[in-house]
């Protein structure tokens, strides 16, 4: 009887330790890159070019022939692949894509405002602060998930953010957050920029500034972030592109499509680098999303968003990485909110995001 009890005791210890080891073995993601493209509609993400907008002389910039030649196909799966080839090949085959409302797969802003600062705050803080109600809002008083991650010993000083729009200095609370935030026309590279960063800074200074000093062209944000990724090896990186929103506000549908297509190409660029580098290969997750939607019921409102635009709360996201089952386009009926992204991002790194404010639960099914 004594031998049996001893054997049971050691068996329980063995099972306990094995379970711990198994749980650690299951966590493969060591790095994450969060990527956003401002105000890019789910309608184009899942349906490709919208012919009703492309045919409208008010929006097609007098070049509907080029738009059709480059982005049109009668079949929707082919059409969306023309616009976003990386999303609909690599991400669709190895990751998950959410937000196609044709299948009642709904992803929405939880905040009631449906524009940028509140949307990004919801993404990173994991809850809705209704006081955050302006793009000119002060430094965000709410702790964001990047800030939380940066305080964890394993990730300390391994977090960085790059954004085309200067408001990210306030959205992420640059004075407080403790990690580099490089936006708009802020020089990259800190006190010791590399030769490539010095060149980027010089080109940025002399560049065309269609959005004044508030926002740079996406090409600069991309190459700043890529140089940081390659030379400083962060474990957590956020990159925010802005031209999809800017060209939409201008009513330039061709430029909007071109910006989205280029965004897709840059995501591919990021992924190919990740898969070629030993630190990142098979150990990195990507989380791709937007801050808000745009109008669609009234096609003239595709340029706009905000609480007075019926469809502007409708968003989408995609995720891929070693811990995410390859489910492709999600066609099951469900409701997801933007405030769930923060905890989902933390969970992919094996963390639970806690803060002085509420944090919504993560999204089930994203992680093995």
Whereabouts are the PLM-identified features?
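Bacterial Sec-dependent N-terminal signal peptides
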Residues: 1-28
């Amino acid at each position: 009887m004594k031998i049996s009890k001893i054997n049971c005791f050691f068996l329980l210890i063995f099972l306990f330790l094995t379970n711990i080891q198994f749980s650690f073995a299951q966590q493969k993601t060591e790095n994450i890159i969060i990527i956003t493209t401002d105000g890019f509609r789910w309608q184009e993400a899942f349906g490709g070019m919208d012919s009703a907008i492309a045919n409208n002389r008010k929006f097609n910039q007098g070049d509907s022939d080029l738009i059709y030649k480059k982005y049109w196909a009668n079949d929707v799966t082919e059409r969306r692949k023309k616009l976003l080839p990386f999303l609909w090949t690599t991400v669709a085959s190895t990751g998950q894509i959410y937000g196609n409302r044709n299948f009642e797969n709904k992803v929405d802003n939880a905040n009631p405002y449906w524009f940028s600062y509140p949307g990004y705050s919801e993404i990173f803080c994991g809850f809705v602060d209704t006081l955050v109600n302006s793009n000119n809002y002060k430094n965000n008083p709410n702790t964001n998930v990047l800030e939380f991650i940066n305080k964890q010993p394993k990730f300390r000083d391994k977090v960085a953010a790059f954004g085309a729009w200067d408001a990210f200095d306030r959205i992420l609370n640059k004075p407080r957050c403790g990690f580099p935030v490089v936006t708009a026309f802020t020089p990259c590279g800190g006190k010791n920029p590399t030769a490539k960063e010095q060149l980027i800074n010089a080109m940025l200074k002399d560049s065309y500034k269609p959005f004044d000093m508030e926002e740079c062209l996406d090409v600069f944000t991309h190459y700043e972030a890529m140089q940081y990724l390659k030379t400083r090896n962060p474990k957590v990186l956020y990159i925010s592109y802005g031209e999809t929103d800017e060209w939409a506000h201008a009513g330039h549908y061709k430029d909007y499509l071109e910006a989205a297509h280029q965004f897709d190409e840059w995501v591919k660029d990021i992924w190919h680098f990740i898969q070629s580098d030993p630190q990142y290969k098979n150990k990195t997750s990507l989380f791709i999303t937007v801050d808000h939607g745009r109008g669609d019921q009234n096609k003239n409102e595709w340029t706009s968003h905000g609480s007075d635009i019926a469809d502007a709360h409708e968003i989408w996201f995609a995720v891929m990485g070693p811990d995410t089952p390859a489910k492709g386009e999600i066609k099951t009926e469900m409701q997801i909110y933007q405030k769930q992204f923060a905890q989902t991002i933390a969970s992919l790194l094996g963390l639970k995001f806690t803060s002085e404010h509420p944090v919504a639960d993560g999204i089930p099914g994203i992680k093995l």
